[in-house]
Amino acid sequence: MYAKLNEFEEKVIRGITEDRWLKLATELIKTGQPRACDPLDPDLPSGEEEAIAMLVAGKLEALGMEVNMYESQPHRPNIVGILKGSGSGPVLMMNDHMDTYPVVEPHKWDKTNFKPFKATRAGDLLYARGSSDTRGNLACTILAAQALVENGIKLKGDLMYCFCVDEERDGTHGSIYLTKEIGIKADYSITAEPTAYGGDATKGDWGMNLSIANGGHCLIEVTLEGDKAHIWRPDTSNNAIVELAKLISHLEIMPFTHEITEFMGHTPPCTTIVRIRGGLPGEMQFSPDSCTVTLAVVGIVPGMTLESIILDIENEVKSFIGERKDITYKVNQVKDCLL
């Protein structure tokens, strides 16, 4: 049972309509794209969120907010807007990010007529890159502030809007920069991120649950090295691709050393295979002597460290290799990828 809304709450809710949201979300989704696409892949260039940042900064200023921009990389400004409260109440932060996943295969975007940044409605769903993660959510947060202002409602404490860059790439130039270098802080924070586990995917509400904590992740590379041989003599080599393919089945189900924490979530510490590389251009006459798999280690909880994660993976690899002397291995964190 939901609590009865008071007069002020009813006024705010009435100001947040579907038509308003759809119009604003459609505008936000297309702005600055595809430049704002920000891949996690450390070997690809990061995005630039400048265009979308300037747009949302203008919208916050139009609501009477004091707006500041902070950037640690050119063309990547973080936006911080403050709607002053009426007294000395706690500061509430509304947090969201302005970068999105990249679009690698636009020919598969049939729901949007192969235009990934064109918001396209189908029934109760809105399709486009960023509609869920998180331009549609961004629209919700802005409309909430607009509804407050339109109805002359002031919170006791300041309402802070913090729109970050670089979220998809671990936040070095976004939330981490703002908190550690600029000193941004609040008493409470609501993050409009749609990836809360626990919804019912069959009903279309996956990612719609509330979460009160967030696990970590990191990228780890595992390389096996064997022997190179001519393709007509596979019996004389230890094909690194073949050996790594066998190892992957072990890495997929391996356990990680960790303690049960107060908030474990629905994803325990585990691995997801995200990339595999083997063989060199111009050497298809030979079996490859080296192959590398990239693992996303997800569900990291307090107490786990980079060292403990690498040690667990090394032990799994050692168990797989056993006493064999014809295969060697390396395990390391992907460069510039945070824990």
Language-model features, listed with the residues they occupy:
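Metal-dependent amide/peptide-bond hydrolase catalytic core
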Residues: 1-19, 48-51, 62, 199-204, ...
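N-terminal helical capping/dimerization or prosegment-like subdomains
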Residues: 2-105, 290-296
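Catalytic metal-binding/acid-base residues of hydrolase active sites
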Residues: 34, 99, 168, 195, ...
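Short secondary-structure junctions
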Residues: 64-70, 118-119, 330-332
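A structural signal for isolated positions on well-ordered beta-strands in alpha/beta enzyme cores
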Residues: 68, 93, 160-162, 330
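Active-site metal-coordination/substrate-binding segment of hydrolases
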Residues: 89-160
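Hydrophobic/aromatic beta-strand patches that form the interior of the parallel beta-sheet core
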Residues: 90-94, 162, 188-190, 272-274, ...
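Fold-level recognition of mixed alpha/beta catalytic cores in primary-metabolism enzymes, strongest
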Residues: 132-253, 262, 287
